[in-house]
Regions:
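Intrinsic-disorder/low-complexity accessory segments
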Residues: 1-466
Length: 466
C-alpha cells in the first residue's frame, strides 16, 4: 500500500500521545529513577579521579565563556572564581570556571568533558575483523566528542574538590568586554584569535567603520599583538567612532586597546603594505537540493547567528544562469552538484572566480570542484595507499589459473586494484597549523578538528595556490 503524508502525521501523533500517557501513568517511577540517577552522580563524583574540571580562561576567552555557559544551559553547576586560587598544585587566576562533578548533572559533565574514552576492546577487535573481511564497520556515530577539545579550550582536572570564592553562572551571562583607553587619539586595536574579535569585525563593517588587518604580528608599548589584529584608525572614521567602538565592544565581548601613538616597536606599521583594508563582503550560500540540510543549516547558523552577518540563500539550480557579480563570497555546502549545476553552472562559477570571487566548498562539494570536468581546484582525490602491489585485472575472457592456499590469499585475490580509503567515523585529531599562511592569522600553532569521511586529496601545487 502507498503511505500518505497524512498517515505519517497520524502515526507520529499516536506515538506521541502514547508516550505522554505512559509517562503520566508511571510518573512516580520515572521521577524516582531520575532522582536516584542524580543522587548516584553526586556520589560518583566524590570518588572520581577527575572530580573537578577547571577552565583557566586565559587563552580564547570567548570560546571558554561559550563552553561554560553552554554547560550552564544544560543544568550543570558552573562556578566562576572571583579570586586567584590553587588546585592540585597549580595556580589559577580569578575568572577561571570550575565544574565539580559531585553534583546532580555530574555524569553529564563527566561524559562531555573527559578527553579520552576508550572503546570496548572486544568491539574494536570485531570492527577490525570486519574490515579485514571487506565488511563495513558497525560504528553508529562519531567516536570522539570531548567538548573542551572541540572548542579548543584549555581544561585541566583535579581529583579533589576546589575551595574558592565565586558565583554560579547562568546560561545568559554575557561575555565581559575589555576596554583600554576608550578615548584613544590614534587608533583602536582588537587582538585577533577568538570569536569575540570576529564578531567585532562583522559588527564594525556593518556599522560602516573603516577597519584594517595586520598580516603580521607587531609590538607596541601597549603590548604584543598577533597577526590578524584589527586596526581602527581614528583619522579614517567619523567623530562618533569612540561611541561606536565602546558599544560594539560591549555587544561582542571583545578586547579593545586604544593607543595614542602609531609608533610600532617591532613589526609592520599601521600604514605599511602589510596592513590590508577590510571590506564588508556579500555572501551567498547554495540552498535547497542537492545540498545537505545539516551542512547548509550549520554553516548559515554560524554566520548569521554567531557572527550576526547576513547570508543570501540561492537555489542551487539558479546558479547555472544567475548573475553572481553582486556577491564576493559563495559557499557550496556538502552535496552532489554534478547534475544540478551541470556544465552551465560550472562555467558560471568559473567565470565568477576568475573575476575575483571567493568560492568555499565543503565536503562533497569539494569533490565536485576538484573533478576533472569542473577543474576549479588543482587537486585530485586519492585512492587508498596499498601495502602490497595488487595484480591488475586482466580483461581477457580466459586467464591463467592461480592457486589460492588460504583465506588471506582469497581476500587478496578479490581486492580491487583501486579503492577509496577506509571511512573515518568521526574522530578528534590534532592539526598542526601553518603559521605563515594569512588564513591562519591568530590561530594557535595546534588545534583540534573533527575528521569524518574518506576524502583524501593530493597537495595543491604552489602555482595554483597554497
Amino acid at each position: 500500500s502507498i503511505l500518505q503524508y497524512r498517515d505519517t502525521v497520524q502515526r507520529h501523533f499516536v506515538a506521541s500521545m502514547a508516550t505522554a500517557e505512559t509517562t503520566a501513568e508511571h510518573r512516580e517511577k520515572i521521577l524516582s529513577d531520575f532522582y536516584l540517577y542524580q543522587q548516584k552522580a553526586i556520589e560518583a563524583g566524590k570518588d572520581d579521579d577527575e572530580r573537578t574540571f577547571i577552565l583557566p580562561n586565559v587563552r580564547d576567552r570567548a570560546a571558554t565563556h561559550r563552553l561554560a555557559t553552554l554547560m550552564a544551559e544544560h543544568g550543570v553547576e558552573v562556578k566562576q572564581a572571583s579570586e586567584s586560587f590553587r588546585a592540585c598544585g597549580e595556580r589559577y587566576k580569578a575568572g577561571a570556571f570550575i565544574i565539580d562533578t559531585a553534583q546532580p548533572r555530574g555524569l553529564f559533565a563527566k561524559t562531555t568533558f573527559t578527553q579520552q574514552v576508550d572503546m570496548d576492546k572486544t568491539f574494536v577487535a570485531e570492527q577490525e575483523r570486519r574490515r579485514a573481511n571487506k565488511l563495513r564497520d558497525q560504528i553508529y556515530d562519531v567516536t570522539g566528542w570531548s567538548l573542551p577539545l572541540m572548542f579548543n579550550v584549555d581544561t585541566e582536572s583535579c581529583d579533589d574538590a576546589v575551595k574558592v570564592k565565586g558565583e554560579m553562572i547562568s546560561a545568559d551571562m554575557p561575555l565581559q568586554s575589555e576596554m583600554v583607553n576608550a578615548d584613544a587619539k590614534v587608533a583602536y586595536l582588537v587582538p585577533w584569535g577568538d570569536m569575540s574579535a570576529g564578531r567585532f569585525l562583522t559588527a564594525a563593517l556593518r556599522a560602516g567603520i573603516q577597519v584594517k588587518s595586520a598580516d603580521q604580528a607587531f609590538k607596541m608599548e601597549s603590548g604584543s599583538y598577533p597577526a590578524g589584529t584589527l586596526i581602527v584608525e581614528v583619522a579614517q572614521n567619523d567623530k562618533t567612532l569612540a561611541e561606536k567602538i565602546s558599544r560594539i565592544a560591549t555587544e561582542t565581548g571583545a578586547r579593545v586597546v586604544g593607543v595614542d601613538t602609531s609608533w610600532v616597536v617591532e613589526g609592520p606599521s599601521f600604514g605599511s603594505e602589510n596592513t590590508a583594508g577590510m571590506s564588508a563582503p556579500k555572501i551567498a550560500i547554495a540552498w535547497d537540493e542537492p545540498t545537505s540540510s545539516l551542512s547548509a543549516g550549520s554553516l548559515r547558523f554560524v554566520i548569521e547567528r554567531q557572527f550576526n552577518y547576513p547570508v543570501t540563500a540561492i537555489r542551487t539550480g539558479n546558479m547555472s544562469w544567475a548573475n553572481l557579480s553582486d556577491y564576493q563570497v559563495i559557499i557550496l555546502p556538502s552535496g552532489n552538484y554534478a547534475r544540478h549545476l551541470g556544465t552551465g553552472g560550472a562555467e558560471n562559477l568559473k567565470d565568477w572566480v576568475s573575476k575575483g570571487g571567493v568560492l568555499i566548498t565543503i565536503a562533497n562539494a569539494t569533490q565536485w570542484a576538484a573533478s576533472e570536468n569542473v577543474g576549479l581546484l588543482d587537486v585530485k582525490r586519492e585512492y587508498a595507499l596499498k601495502d602490497d602491489d595488487v595484480t591488475a585485472q586482466d580483461d581477457s575472457d580466459v586467464i591463467e589459473g592461480t592457486t589460492i592456499e588460504n583465506r588471506e590469499g582469497f581476500l587478496n585475490a578479490i581486492e580491487n586494484e583501486q579503492e577509496l580509503p577506509d571511512y573515518v567515523a568521526g574522530i578528534l585529531t590534532r592539526v598542526e597549523v601553518d603559521q605563515e599562511h594569512w588564513l591562519t592569522a591568530g590561530v594557535n600553532p595546534e588545534v583540534v578538528a573533527m575528521v569524518t569521511g574518506n576524502d583524501i586529496y593530493s597537495p595543491i601545487k604552489l602555482g595554483s595556490g597554497k
